[in-house]
């Protein structure tokens, strides 16, 4: 059996880091099991689904390193769903209902008042053909419910009916179908809710494992029943915990700041986003994996906590810095060249500055420091200005190397009596225009004698 998984986003908005957790969990599970990954757009809501969102999702996944083996659109498969509807109708498992939302709400309140579970009472099953015709003559159109197998022979005599599965994340799970309403599969206008197309596609596409958020745990009992009603063996299920904001709020497509696109535009590395999305809320330590192969080594569905995990942007910042600070030159080289950073000193420059980067784009500012002019003259006090001028008069001739800074500052210390911060800070400001940054022993060689002299205040 070939392991086949799917990620099925609705292209009604941009995906966020919570969606990324689901996509990457499926991708890594397939990768570790030599399986297949299907990207399936749940675009049955044709009015809200937009091609621009579908394209954005594809771009976001590609940026993260997720490359589907197959791409499908549910909007192109309505004829397949129609056949499944007819099959369920013929089997007596899909029945027409005519209640309005207000009528259903009144019935729900009445059941609660009688201390009964607020589930649908299957009143529509009692309608005669004449009563249905009369309702349709009034202009009502039916919606269609799936008849859950929670009874022996009388659908009005429901009984405890347990559905069991061994969850890849949560272990043995049980759902009682008697506590649920028969789900609506087809709306009044003939469009489909999520449930039926999802099950039909999973069957048709040979999906063997469904990995998704634990907000779908209850749905699983219903979906297993539909799989069986359509004559299929249910796949293996795994439900990971959900990500929330620091304040505990659920993530949504309206949380724009946490969309994958916004994180990319903010300069985060894809592996920083991927590492946090996968490792947060697990028993694994949250560390930055340099690539997908390394992340796969730490990926284990069984290690995921059953409690929700809070997404802290500061953790993402820390992971991003870790990746940049340890990034080898060969990996950074193409990106440096794209920024015009190349030549004989590119490698030594990268090794000098990488430990001070929060974002890769910060590298351009440091390249300007070592190869261009400072944006503005450093703000030095009169005493510090005189000190720096004296120090610059003591600059040794080239060639310079890694020991030049030490020998120069020792000479300056002897000549001026300054030491520690009082010596180094004015020189740093004069050389770089910044109060903090890479080791000056490394930068001085990169700046060179002539450019250093040009910065004499």
From Swiss-Prot:
Species this chain originates from: Brucella canis (strain ATCC 23365 / NCTC 10854 / RM-666)
Residues passing through the membrane, by range: none
EC number(s) on file: 6.1.1.17
Any one GO biological process: glutamyl-tRNA aminoacylation
InterPro entries reported in the protein's UniProt record: aa-tRNA-synth_I_cd-bd, aa-tRNA-synth_I_codon-bd_sub2, aa-tRNA-synth_I_CS, aa_tRNA-synth_I_cd-bd_sf, Glu-tRNA-ligase_bac/mito, Glu/Gln-tRNA-synth, Glu/Gln-tRNA-synth_Ib_cat-dom, GluQ/Sye
Gene label: gltX1
Top-level enzyme category: ligase
Role noted for this protein: Catalyzes the attachment of glutamate to tRNA(Glu) in a two-step reaction: glutamate is first activated by ATP to form Glu-AMP and then transferred to the acceptor end of tRNA(Glu).
Ligand binding (ATP): 253
CDD domains listed in its UniProt record: GluRS_core (cd00808)
PANTHER family linked to this entry: GLUTAMATE--TRNA LIGASE (PTHR43311), GLUTAMATE--TRNA LIGASE, MITOCHONDRIAL-RELATED (PTHR43311:SF2)
Gene Ontology annotations for the cellular component aspect, listed alphabetically: cytoplasm
Subunit structure: Monomer.
Identification of the protein by name: Glutamate--tRNA ligase 1
The entry's keywords: Aminoacyl-tRNA synthetase, ATP-binding, Cytoplasm, Ligase, Nucleotide-binding, Protein biosynthesis
